[in-house]
């Protein structure tokens, strides 16, 4: 295992969002994390997936992970999870719905 991927393994062992923020020494506002925790972590994972950690040393890998966390956190500081549409349920357009009371019989 290279040192770049070792940083990822270290992060995978953490179980709480706050632990990840602390491990990467990234400041955060608890009220933002409490409201958008799952969304921030999902977006963080998306940003991490776009980075090739294999050739990176430990310091560069930690900096890249911190940058990814910073970007994910910033996405939710000034906007809501609904606006960011991280999860499929928010991104998927709702189906058209016509209630039965909205139907009428037209006679010719």
From Swiss-Prot:
GO biological process: nitrogen fixation
A Pfam family recorded for this sequence: NifW
Entries under InterPro entries matching the protein: NifW (IPR004893)
Alphabetically ordered keywords of this record: Nitrogen fixation
Disulfide bonds: none
HAMAP family, sorted: NifW
Family: Belongs to the NifW family.
NCBIfam families: PRK00810.1 (NF002009)
Function: May protect the nitrogenase Fe-Mo protein from oxidative damage.
Subunit structure: Homotrimer; associates with NifD.
Name of protein: Nitrogenase-stabilizing/protective protein NifW
Native organism: Cereibacter sphaeroides (strain ATCC 17025 / ATH 2.4.3)
Gene: nifW
């Amino acid at each position: 295992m290279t040192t770049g991927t070792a940083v990822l393994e270290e992060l995978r062992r953490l179980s709480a969002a706050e632990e990840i923020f602390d491990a990467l020494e990234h400041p955060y506002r608890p009220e933002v994390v409490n409201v958008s925790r799952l969304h921030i972590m999902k977006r963080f994972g998306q940003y991490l997936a776009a980075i090739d950690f294999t050739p990176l040393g430990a310091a560069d890998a930690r900096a890249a992970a911190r940058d990814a966390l910073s970007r994910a956190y910033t996405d939710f500081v000034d906007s809501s999870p609904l606006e960011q549409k991280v999860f499929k349920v928010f991104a998927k357009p709702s189906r058209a719905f016509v209630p039965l009371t909205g139907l009428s019989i037209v006679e010719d």
